Amino acid sequence: VPLIAGEARSDIVRDVSNVDSSPRNRAPGAGSHRTPLHALSAADSAWLRVDRDNNRMIITAVLTLERGVPFAKVQARLVDRLLPYPRLQQRIVTPKFAFGVPHWEDDPDFDIARQTEVVKLDNPADQSELESFVGGLMEQSLPVDRPLWRIYYVEKYVEKYDEKYDERVTAGGRTSDSSSAGAALVVRVHHCIADGIALLRILLSLSDEPPEITFPTAAAEWARSGKRASIARRVALGARTAARSIAHFANFLVSRSDPDTRFSTPLGRTKRAAWSNPIALEDIKQIGRASSGTVNEVLLSAAAGALGRVLEEDPQFESGLELRGVVPVNLRGDEPLSALGNKFGLVFMPMPVGIADSEARLEHVRESMARIKASPEALGWFAMLRALGRVPTWMEALGVELFSRKATLVITSLAGPKQQLHFCGSAIEDVMFWVPCAGNVGLGMSMLSYNGRVRLGVTADVGQLNNPAEIASEFESELRGSTSAGR
């Protein structure tokens, strides 16, 4: 039985070739000229095509603010910081022929008011209400007659979580007065516009003090060595990498599918979102120092342990169970972000969910990471994604089905700004994001550090996991237990 239900999404794009494209209702600061049609890159097209009714290919992020900001100021900041990127003012034109390529076109009706919305939840709204709102958004598509992004300004948001674990965080205590109540920005951007690295850097550029942030890249070492090497040496290196990639994919194709668990069941359309309490980054570093592990390895191990705790009551669970997590790997390097787009590969990370002992589990993760770093897997999958963006729909569906059978979740970890940022004078208290999933993969786990703390964001299909907060809670327990053991 195919894991992919139906054909590739067709409603995400439409033919707008006859729409009047004269510039009107443009936001202040936006260009008034029409740029020529520009074809989506192969990688961007791939992420557009894998969008499904039951698995939206949309990245979601949340920025929580200490104090509310007048909505007019919010819109003015968005115009100032986002509109210099032409892609964010463009919509997608579907090809007229079956084998055509979708294109970007300036939206003639672009207006920041059409891309933003004020949301009023409970007065004030707390984390549970915001989680419910975010989960509901994950079920929805984006309007296809405009750029594929949208930002919601949630009024009067007040976080409430366990104050004991991080005494530096104030839980509650605010009044419902708009001058003291907080707020939140919920950002949704379709994956075809840009990858998570690019979007995170753009979102953080909304701050009053845009930080200079760099992210680890698998291409960095190759690029550095390439500058020193001769052309012949670089060609030889590329040939060897290609040969290794082919061998790797051959092994991947004959490798086993992931074991059946509750996360193997078909997806529905209802999604849930949750996030953990903040965990002090210094505590995570302490765990790493005690076990010779990196922060990333500690986080991946804790995530595997949390997933194992949630699964241990399932009949399919057994000691030593291993599930694959798809990990995005940055290939962008230090190039400018003006063109946005998707420039990342994928690696399939063995997640030792069936190892209860935290030290043994961390050692397993460390060994797996060492093998992955020495392999060409990320570059190979980037090439595969580009191919999926150009092949016929039925071939793309087969590729996504293969992807679904070989993995159970998508998981990522990013290091954000070390200092607190501000948005229009209001402190940005936390930054969170959720990776989209593809095919029949319905579980996503995203870890991000910001201002000396780390949070885990979890998204899940309700048919596979009704309450993703279970994983978030177990993630905290794993790290607290490891911290206590190391002291």
Predicted features and spans:
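Soluble acyl-CoA-dependent acyltransferase catalytic core bearing the H(X)4D motif
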Residues: 3, 11-43, 50-52, 56-441, ...
